[in-house]
């Protein structure tokens, strides 16, 4: 019997620079010959690296990846601020950063590590009354997005270069979803009084998916293929709860099971390796959060 979700799953794309996340989706729709393609976590055109894309029923799973952690390698230039907080904007402030010493930089980096309040860039993809902030800015509106809590668990300076009054920092950042790396660059420059902006960004991880999983977009256009099946995606993303085939049938119909003392969301997997659903204990029920294989398929 054919598996109804055999063509569903995730593609971990190594996004090239100069392309929007939606551009990637459009190209993969053609490559996979389906409209059911979507992505989790927007990458700016200048950024490269991990972009997780759902195919067919995998698109419905993407909502359960939104709150995951992410990791980036980036380059921050100290000595100038721009309108967009990255290299593509116009310079609005500059100052000589050559006098900064390592201790000053370390102190400022430390102040932006941990649980912090961060104000997203005005040209972000955040929606304000149904319209993205960057679209409002492009239309001439003044956009002010309130600061919100984010977590920066790792903010390490890997290398430092000094030239022409600028200090370029190669950094590695691990952070919660919703953290803007160019906002970190802006805030680091502000803390040091010299301005700062992002000049390079590469996303290396989205939750459990890394650059090792990523396939260059050009390769996918020549040979469209999943990085992970829907079964593999659920089992990779969440702790596995082994269930019987009968329990799997019940979950596929949206029924609940008896509680097992679980904490958090688990992937319910049958002995044959089929990931049936994401489940979570709610009161006296083990209920479905997302059904990967509904019996209606």
From Swiss-Prot:
Keywords noted in UniProt: Isomerase, tRNA processing
Family: Belongs to the pseudouridine synthase TruB family. Type 1 subfamily.
Name the UniProt record assigns to this protein: tRNA pseudouridine synthase B
GO BP of this protein: mRNA pseudouridine synthesis; tRNA pseudouridine synthesis
Species this chain originates from: Corynebacterium efficiens (strain DSM 44549 / YS-314 / AJ 12310 / JCM 11189 / NBRC 100395)
HAMAP family: TruB_bact
EC number: 5.4.99.25
Molecular function terms, GO-annotated: RNA binding; tRNA pseudouridine(55) synthase activity
InterPro entries attached to this UniProt entry: PsdUridine_synth_cat_dom_sf, PsdUridine_synth_N, PUA-like_sf, PUA_sf, tRNA_psdUridine_synth_fam2_C, tRNA_psdUridine_synth_TruB, TruB_C
Function: Responsible for synthesis of pseudouridine from uracil-55 in the psi GC loop of transfer RNAs.
